[in-house]
Curated annotation (Swiss-Prot):
The keyword Cytoplasm does not apply. GO terms for biological process: translation. This is Large ribosomal subunit protein uL5. It comes from Rickettsia africae (strain ESF-5). Keywords: Ribonucleoprotein, Ribosomal protein, RNA-binding, rRNA-binding, tRNA-binding. InterPro entries: Ribosomal_uL5, Ribosomal_uL5_bac-type, Ribosomal_uL5_C, Ribosomal_uL5_CS, Ribosomal_uL5_dom_sf, Ribosomal_uL5_N. This is one of the proteins that bind and probably mediate the attachment of the 5S RNA into the large ribosomal subunit, where it forms part of the central protuberance. In the 70S ribosome it contacts protein S13 of the 30S subunit (bridge B1b), connecting the 2 subunits; this bridge is implicated in subunit movement. Contacts the P site tRNA; the 5S rRNA and some of its associated proteins might help stabilize positioning of ribosome-bound tRNAs. NCBIfam families: PRK00010.1. Belongs to the universal ribosomal protein uL5 family. Pfam families: Ribosomal_L5 (PF00281), Ribosomal_L5_C (PF00673). One of its GO terms (cellular component) is ribosome. GO terms for molecular function: rRNA binding; structural constituent of ribosome; tRNA binding.
Amino acid sequence: MLRFKELYQQKIIENLQKKFSYKNKHEIPQIKKIVINMGVGEATADSKVINNAVNDLTLISGQKPVVTLARKSIATFKLRENMKIGCKVTLRKDRMYDFLERLVIVALPRVKEFRGFSYKSFDGKGNFTFGLKEQIVFPEINYDKIDTIRGMDITIVTSAKTDQESKFLLSGFNLPFYN
């Protein structure tokens, strides 16, 4: 069932070892966690909108998300401190590999005009962040039952020390990159 976990253990570790020649097996980069964040700006006007976002993120990730609160009040956005403004979920271990597999095999091919990810999305420490504009690219979301199309930010946190190691690791999982 967890093909990506087996792929990492059987092929990707071996390829990383050949390319970067690590002295210790604990130096080999791995994916630590995947964080999915969904900001809901409309929640300032209607507090029920956040529940729909939580339901969508639960279906996508298979895990109940945490509702995020505003840290401080901002009058121009009509935002008060401790107001619900989004939700996030952190995936680790088997759920992380399951989500990554569904993302690469099912969701990304359904994104319109998707050419791949830019290498500029790495943060310099081996972590990779990108955004999706629609939650409907995941088959778990029923288009007829959603109230509005929402995007999400996805961060893949790795133990890689450099972006080059992280790029090689994520390319092993068939994440499409360009340039």
